[in-house]
A protein has these predicted regions:
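Extracellular/periplasmic catalytic domains that process cell-envelope and extracellular macromolecules
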Residues: 55-57, 80-83, 119-124, 175-176
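Solvent-exposed loop/turn segments at secondary-structure junctions
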Residues: 5-9, 68-71, 94-97, 133-137, ...
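The feature captures the conserved acid-bearing segment of alpha/beta-hydrolase catalytic domains
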Residues: 86-170
Length: 206
């Protein structure tokens, strides 16, 4: 993931939630930002610019995101399904935007541009949900809790499993091709280095 400074992309609205809404926790049509202002809209032009500067002919790129970066990474896939990304590893997100049409964004798809998401295209992308086997502390620092997000589970391990399983169930029920994977990193907690090492192995060696 590129670095997004807090001064330019402040807080969870500007980074984790992609600056899609002025207030991502309270979405409405009146507070929907223009798509060019979304943080998610930075990635593709950045890839093009980097290729031009390096005279690089690479057709696609990979994304590894851990914790808050994993929140950004999976939502990037949701909002930019036609991006030139090859593989995404979303590691240990604190919580997810789930594929629930009856739950409002950011916890579900309702009241957002994702309401009419194309699941066929979404599930054809290569997303790996990575989580440490010991990343199961419900009192972990900065882990969000409220009555809605706790429906996803009470810790990162539960939430990762439920997010993946729910998506897989939708794919099965609609008889869609499903290219997502769920990987548990043995004996790993919320350690960034362990997560990135495993993610790199998943992308480049498997």
């Amino acid at each position: 993931m590129p670095e997004f400074t807090n001064s330019q992309f402040p807080g969870g609205d500007g980074y984790n939630l992609g600056n899609v809404f002025i207030d991502g926790d309270n979405p409405s049509l009146s507070t929907l930002n223009p798509e060019p202002e979304w943080t998610f809209s930075v990635i593709e032009p950045l890839f093009t610019y980097t290729k031009q500067q390096l005279n690089n002919q690479t057709a696609k790129y990979h994304i590894i995101g851990h914790s808050a970066e994993a929140q950004f990474a999976h939502r990037f896939l949701f909002f930019k399904p036609e991006a030139k990304v090859d593989k995404i590893v979303a590691s240990a997100a604190g919580w997810y935007t789930t594929l629930e049409l009856d739950i409002n964004f950011p916890y579900g798809l309702n009241s957002s541009p994702l309401e009419n998401m194309d699941y066929t295209q979404l599930f054809s992308n290569h997303l790996t949900v990575l989580i440490g086997s010991n990343d199961n502390d419900p009192n972990s620092s900065s882990l969000r809790h409220n009555s809605i997000v706790d429906l996803q589970g009470l810790n990162r391990l539960e939430r990762a499993s439920n997010f993946y399983t729910n998506a897989q169930s939708i794919a099965v029920n609609q008889e869609l091709n499903f290219e997502w994977n769920y990987v548990i990193n043995p004996n790993a907690d919320h350690n960034y280095l362990l997560a990135v090492s495993k993610a790199a192995d998943l992308i480049f060696n498997q």
